[in-house]
């Protein structure tokens, strides 16, 4: 992998990740852009203890432009985009309309491919590995920013999810705090460790799932299953079999196997609802250990956390979506219409032949 860092016309960072070591990236952003002014602010809820990012400038962000005006496609002639070069393998840049900025963190856009009409599932294993390497490098770089405590790599896919750009891409949020979801896992981890005399909860969950009937896919270094208490109609958790706290901890064997396993999962998701159905909308979310101090979680260290990817769709059946209504939105109690055992069975049924 070759990495080339440059700047866009308004000063935002752009990083190219290339498969070939001899690739030259010297194109200049010719757009007359002024420096981005953001209004990102993080406010803490005194009752719930969680945080809300207030970012009113995002109301003016680009919304479903036609393909020939896509800001994530390479620049061609007089059609200038966020990517100044006429081609790229993987490109990452600071979001022009960030939810988090300055002391409130940082937001980046990850372009998986220059092919506007592709999806992650269409990538070659070599290209998917390059995306993994880009995620890993950005996790490392962002973790060193003084305001950053946790790095979150994710992909929203599909208009039903709320995606505003059709080009295949993901995002990275670098938070200035430990997120509430991660804090819950760390508290459970600490309680289990204390109650069992040191047993790791992630290890116990993975062992139990691998011995059960909700396994979807298992390789030499990765395992995917539908969790016992899945929140979503079709939800899969993908774990490396060797526990590591973040993407940086993956060894070469796990990195090599990841593309094959992950691409197969994504392709199965597109087959869940049968032939003739539109692509399945999904969210893919990497859970990594925070880089900040963990004194709040007694007895827990970063190495106790287990890196894993959560992949789920909000489509519960053909033509119908799972909405977060009263119980979910008001009380945070999920109602799942699809038994996890049936979801796992269906995901095994649609395996590639």
Language-model features and meaning:
Residues 1-353:
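HIT superfamily nucleotide-processing domains
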């Amino acid at each position: 992998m070759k990495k080339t860092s440059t700047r866009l016309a308004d000063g935002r960072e752009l990083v190219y990740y290339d498969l070939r070591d001899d690739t030259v990236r010297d194109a200049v952003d010719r757009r007359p852009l002024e420096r981005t002014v953001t209004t990102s602010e993080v406010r803490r809820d005194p009752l719930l203890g969680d945080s809300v990012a207030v970012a009113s400038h995002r109301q003016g962000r680009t919304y479903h432009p036609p393909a020939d005006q896509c800001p994530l496609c390479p620049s061609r002639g007089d059609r200038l985009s966020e990517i100044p070069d006429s081609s790229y393998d993987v490109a990452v840049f600071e979001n022009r309309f960030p939810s988090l900025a300055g002391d409130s963190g940082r937001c980046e856009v990850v372009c998986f491919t220059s092919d506007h009409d592709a999806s992650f599932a269409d990538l070659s294993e070599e290209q998917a590995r390059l995306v993994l390497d880009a995620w890993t490098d950005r996790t490392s770089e962002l973790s060193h920013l003084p305001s950053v405590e946790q790095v979150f790599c994710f992909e929203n896919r599909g208009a039903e999810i709320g995606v505003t750009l059709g080009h295949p891409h993901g995002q990275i949020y670098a938070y200035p705090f430990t997120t509430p979801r991660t804090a819950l896992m760390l508290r459970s981890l600490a309680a289990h460790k204390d109650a069992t005399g040191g047993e790791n909860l992630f290890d116990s969950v993975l062992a139990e799932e691998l011995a059960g009937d909700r396994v979807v896919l298992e390789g030499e270094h990765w395992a995917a299953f539908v969790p016992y208490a899945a929140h979503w109609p079709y939800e899969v958790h993908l774990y490396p079999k060797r526990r590591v706290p973040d993407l940086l901890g993956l060894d070469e064997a796990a990195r090599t196997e990841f593309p094959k396993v992950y691409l197969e999962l994504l392709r199965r998701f597109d087959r869940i609802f049968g032939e003739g159905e539109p692509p399945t909308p999904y969210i893919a979310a990497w859970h990594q250990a925070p880089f900040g101090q963990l004194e709040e979680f007694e007895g827990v260290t970063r190495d106790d956390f287990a890196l894993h990817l959560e992949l789920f769709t909000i489509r519960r059946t053909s033509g119908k979506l799972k909405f977060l209504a009263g119980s979910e939105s008001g009380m945070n109690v999920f109602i799942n219409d699809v038994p996890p055992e049936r979801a796992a069975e269906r995901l095994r049924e649609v395996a590639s032949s």
